[in-house]
Every structure is written in C-alpha cells, then in structure tokens.
Amino acid sequence: GDHWDRVAERGLDRAVPIVTTTHAAPRLQRRGFAAARGIDTWDNVTVSHGAASVTMTSLPGKHAPTPVDRLLPPVMGTMLEFTTSAEAAPRRLYVSGDTLLIEELDEIPVRCGAIDAGILHLGGTRLPAGNKLPFGLTVTMDGRQGTEAVQRLGLPRVIPVHFDDYAVFASPRQDFIDSMTARGLADRVVVLERGHTVSL
C-alpha cells in the first residue's frame, strides 16, 4: 500500500473522494481535498455505478500499545464489499491498514461475514530505527502477528504488503511466509511484486 506523503498528495486530483478516519478528514479538507469523508469504526459508505457497488466499512485498528497509541493518529482497517448485482453474492476484501494484532479484529468476521481475501500491512515497523537498534516501538504487525491475523480472520488468501519501503521495517516478507509455512498455511499466501496484478 502507498503511504500518504507529499509526493502522493501532489499527484492526486483534489476532487477525488477519500474515505478515512474522522481524525484525518478535516486535515485533508484543509489541504484542498473537499470530498474527504471521515467515518467511525463499523460505519460504512457505499459507492454505486449502475448495478455494481462497493461498500467500505471502517474496521478496528491500533498503531501502538496503550497508552502510547494515544500519542499517534488513529488508524483503521477497511472491509471492501463488492457486488455486481442485487442477486450476486458479495465479495469481501479485508485491508488491515497499519494496525497491530488486537483483540478487536476477532469481531470482523462476526460482523462482516466470511472474507474472500486480505491485504495485510506487515513489516513489523519498529520506531525509531527498525533493526538498527535492539529496542523500539512496534507499530505494525510482523510475520508472526500477520499469521495469527490470517487464522483469526479465516482468510483463505492473503497478500502481504508494507514490509520493505523504509528502514524502520524489522520483519521482511519472508518472516511472514516462513511463519505461514510453519503453520501449514503457505498455500494461502499470494506474493505480489511491485507493478504486477493478481486476480483473486
């Protein structure tokens, strides 16, 4: 997944609709993104085009252990539920966002139903210096936590992302693959290289 930074912001049409946290929406609006809309956890927004629609539901996420999480901006995961007609069964894609493994994730399949695939933000992001220091604050799932999330959410297919963009990542993609393999789940991993596409 891309990170919101000055480069990404410069390249975006200011009229593009953005669904985000209630914390981020007013900040984006002040930067000229008038269509930014903040939603609370478990709220959703639906966008339709003809008979097709996608419903985006805000899901629980936490960027750091309590009480440190209060010092960081809130994060959210997203359930994307795609339908092509009133009769078609919805297809659900879970996007974790930059969260740790938290108990609230267990509510997701209960509230949202069976999930078809997931995109997990991994990397074991550790501030301030990744693996360069023997200590730090971990703010995203590492390979082991990602594997646990796959099991708890019942994800039949999973695409790991967000693991090698910056020097603060402490858990490469191979950590996740090794952890999934150790639990007999290697066949669920979809390795997606930059610039490539995959059909799920």
Regions found by a protein language model. Give the residues of each.
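Helix-loop-beta element that forms the nucleotide-linked donor phosphate-binding surface
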Residues: L28-D40
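Di-metal (Zn2+ and/or Mg2+/Mn2+) metal-binding site signature of metallo-dependent hydrolases
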Residues: G1-D13, T22-R27, L105
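Metabolite-binding pocket within alpha/beta catalytic cores that recognizes anionic/polar moieties
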Residues: A8, A15, G32-A35
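Cap/insert and terminal regions of metallo-dependent hydrolase folds
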Residues: P17, H23-P26, L100-R194
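Generic recognition of short, well-ordered alpha-helical segments
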Residues: V7, R31, A170-Q174
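Core dinuclear metal-dependent hydrolase active-site scaffold
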Residues: I39-G113, R194-L200
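Short active-site oxyanion
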Residues: L12-I18, R91-L93
